Amino acid sequence: MAKKGLFTYAGRTNQGDAKFGSGECAMVTASAGAQATFKKNKQLDWSIHFIPYHDDVKGAPQNSIIGGASLWVMGGKKPEEYKGVAKFLAFLSQPEIQMEWHTTTGYVPITQASYELTRKSGFYDKNPGADMPVKQLTNKAPTENSKGLRFGNFVQGREVIEEELEAVFAGKKDAKTALDDAVKRANDILRKFEAANK
């Protein structure tokens, strides 16, 4: 596809969003949060759909895994600080606050209550597809492979995958070789994490 000009790799972050927004490309795989940017572009006629899948694969489509930013609470602080953190997290988790955040940014609401509140408000009727990221995450009961990722050195592992994909996109490696190399390199990273945390 790349050789025929049907696929263009725009980079690891959100550079593809700009190409889509300008009309340079017809399709983009993007974060749920890209909806806010696309909505601001009044000249852009766009819609949002399920991630493509092979319908001949047993159980397809499965849930996509959650990504995006996280809030972390670190150890070693004073009890009063944790009380403040707890109040802040409780505030962020309120259905009304989550609905506002979700409808403004496009990011997925963090509770079922906030999703239901958004649905009942008519937001999804007025913004078709805005609930697609929620549907992709909750399509089925989670499997071992769709519960989300939690492992040490995640960022380094993701970088390996990105490097190997870039080698395929540039025509430097075939998909099988890149996948095998990604597995080997990522496993090496995991072994180092395991050794450092015994």
Q: Each PLM stretch: what is its role?
A:
Residues 19, 55, 143, 184-189:
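A short structural micro-motif
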Residues 1-8, 39-108, 141-146, 173:
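Extracytoplasmic/periplasmic substrate-recognition and gating elements
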Residues 14, 79, 83, 151-155, ...:
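Soluble non-cytosolic domains of exported or imported proteins
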Residues 167-180:
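Short, charged, surface-exposed loops that flank catalytic or proteolytic processing sites
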Residues 103-163, 167, 197-198:
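Long, aromatic- and glycine/proline-rich binding clefts that accommodate carbohydrate-like moieties
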Residues 27-29, 97-100, 187-193:
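Secretory-pathway/luminal and periplasmic proteins that interact with or process carbohydrate-rich
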Residues 1-41, 83, 178:
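Extracytoplasmic ligand-binding clamshell segments of periplasmic binding protein
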Residues 177-180, 184-198:
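Short, low-complexity disordered leader/linker segments with a strong preference
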